[in-house]
Curated annotation (Swiss-Prot):
Acetyl-CoA carboxylase is a heterohexamer composed of biotin carboxyl carrier protein (AccB), biotin carboxylase (AccC) and two subunits each of ACCase subunit alpha (AccA) and ACCase subunit beta (AccD). Pathway: Lipid metabolism; malonyl-CoA biosynthesis; malonyl-CoA from acetyl-CoA: step 1/1. The keyword Aminoacyl-tRNA synthetase does not apply. It is an enzyme of class 2 (transferase). Residues 31-292 form the CoA carboxyltransferase C-terminal domain. Component of the acetyl coenzyme A carboxylase (ACC) complex. First, biotin carboxylase catalyzes the carboxylation of biotin on its carrier protein (BCCP) and then the CO(2) group is transferred by the carboxyltransferase to acetyl-CoA to form malonyl-CoA. The gene is accA. Belongs to the AccA family. It is found in: Cytoplasm. It comes from Sorangium cellulosum (strain So ce56). It catalyses: N(6)-carboxybiotinyl-L-lysyl-[protein] + acetyl-CoA = N(6)-biotinyl-L-lysyl-[protein] + malonyl-CoA. This is Acetyl-coenzyme A carboxylase carboxyl transferase subunit alpha. GO terms for biological process: fatty acid biosynthetic process; malonyl-CoA biosynthetic process. Its EC number is 2.1.3.15.
C-alpha cells in the first residue's frame, strides 16, 4: 500500500490511516470519539488544502492510482444480479472490457466498462486495461442487445487507450472502435457514461457516446496522454506537466467545455481511499442522471445524443 502512495498525497494518506485506527478504537470505547472527531476534521481540512492546489498532471496521476476502484469494484457495490457476458462471437473474449446484465435500483440494465488489473498477473490478463478489437466488438454486441430489449446502458471509462499492438491492428482496431461509436450513436435507449479513472483517446470514446457523461472529481479524459502529447509536440516527454495543463483534461475543464455533464465529488483523499464511499457518491449521481431521461422515447434519445455531440467545440478566428 505504501508503494502506491503518491508523494503529494502522503500527508493526507497518513492521517487517513490514523483515522481508521482511531475509528476502530472508538467503536469499542466511546471515550475516543471526541479525539476521532477532531482528527477527522483536521484530515478533511488538510485534504482540502492539498487537493485544491493540485496541478493537472497530479490529477492525472491520481486518475491512474493503483488502488483506485475499477469497473468491477463499482459493479460489486452498485448492482445486483450481475451476469457477465463474454466474447465477441468472432475471435475471443477480451478481459480488458467487462460487460453484462445487472439490476440497478430494481431496473434491468446493461453494464459495460474497461477493467484494469491489480498486480502483475491480473494486469497481464486484463492487458493493463487496453482493449483489443474483440473487446470493442463485445461491447457492440452488448449495445445491440440492450437496444433489442430496451435496457438502459451504463458504461464505465478507465483506459489509457486502445491496445496498439500488431495483432490488434491486423484484426481491425480502428474499424472496431469506429463501429462501437456508430453502435452507441444509433441505439434507442438511454446511455450514461462515467469516467472513473483515466479516459484516453478513441479507446475511451468507444464507451463514451452517451446521452450524459459523468466524471469523477480526479478523473481525466483526453485525446492523448500528457506524456504522449509532450513527446509529439516538443519531442520532450519531460514536459508532460505543461501538456497536461494545455490539454484541459481535468474534471473542471471538461465541465466548462461541455464534454461532461456532471462532476462527482470523491471521498477525502480520492476514490482510492474509500471504495464504498466513492460508490455511494457515484450511485446518487448516476441514478439521478438515469431517471432524468425516463420520459424520452427511442427517437428522442438518439436525437438528444446527436445534438449533444454536435454541440461540442467552437470555431475560433
Amino acid at each position: 500500500m505504501a508503494a502506491s502512495i503518491l508523494p503529494f498525497e502522503k500527508p493526507v494518506a497518513e492521517l487517513i490511516e490514523k483515522v481508521r485506527e482511531l475509528r476502530a478504537l472508538a467503536a469499542a470505547d466511546p471515550r475516543f470519539e471526541p479525539e476521532l472527531a477532531q482528527l477527522e476534521d483536521n484530515t478533511g481540512r488538510l485534504a482540502r488544502e492539498i487537493f485544491a492546489g493540485l496541478t493537472p498532471m497530479q490529477k492525472v496521476l491520481l486518475s491512474r492510482h493503483a488502488n483506485r476502484p475499477y469497473t468491477l469494484d463499482y459493479i460489486k457495490r452498485l448492482f445486483t444480479d450481475w451476469v457477465e457476458l463474454k466474447g465477441d462471437r468472432r475471435f475471443a473474449d477480451d478481459c480488458s472490457i467487462v460487460g453484462g446484465l445487472a439490476t440497478y435500483h430494481g431496473r434491468s440494465v446493461v453494464v459495460v466498462g474497461h477493467q484494469k488489473g491489480r498486480g502483475a498477473k491480473e494486469n497481464v490478463k486484463r492487458n493493463f486495461g487496453m482493449p483489443h478489437p474483440e473487446g470493442y466488438r463485445k461491447a457492440i454486441r452488448l449495445y445491440e442487445m440492450a437496444d433489442r430489449f430496451g435496457l438502459p446502458i451504463l458504461t464505465f471509462i478507465d483506459t489509457m487507450g486502445a491496445y496498439p499492438g500488431i495483432g490488434a491492428e491486423e484484426r481491425g482496431q480502428s474499424e472496431a472502435i469506429g463501429a462501437a461509436l456508430a453502435a452507441m450513436a444509433r441505439v434507442g435507449v438511454p446511455i450514461v457514461a462515467t469516467v472513473i479513472g483515466e479516459g484516453g483517446s478513441g479507446g475511451a470514446l468507444a464507451l463514451g457516446v452517451a446521452n450524459r457523461v459523468l466524471v469523477l472529481e480526479f478523473s481525466c479524459y483526453s485525446v492523448i496522454s500528457p506524456e504522449g502529447c509532450a513527446a509529439i509536440l516538443w519531442k520532450d516527454g519531460s514536459r508532460a506537466d505543461e501538456a497536461a495543463a494545455r490539454l484541459k483534461i481535468t474534471a473542471p475543464d471538461l465541465l466548462q467545455l461541455g464534454v461532461v455533464d456532471t462532476i462527482v465529488e470523491e471521498p477525502t483523499g480520492g476514490a482510492h481511499q474509500d471504495h464504498d464511499d466513492a460508490a455511494a457518491r457515484l450511485d446518487k449521481a448516476l441514478w439521478a442522471t438515469l431517471t432524468s431521461m425516463d420520459g424520452l422515447g427511442p427517437e428522442e434519445l438518439v436525437d438528444d445524443r446527436y445534438r449533444r455531440f454536435r454541440g461540442l467545440g467552437s470555431f475560433v478566428g
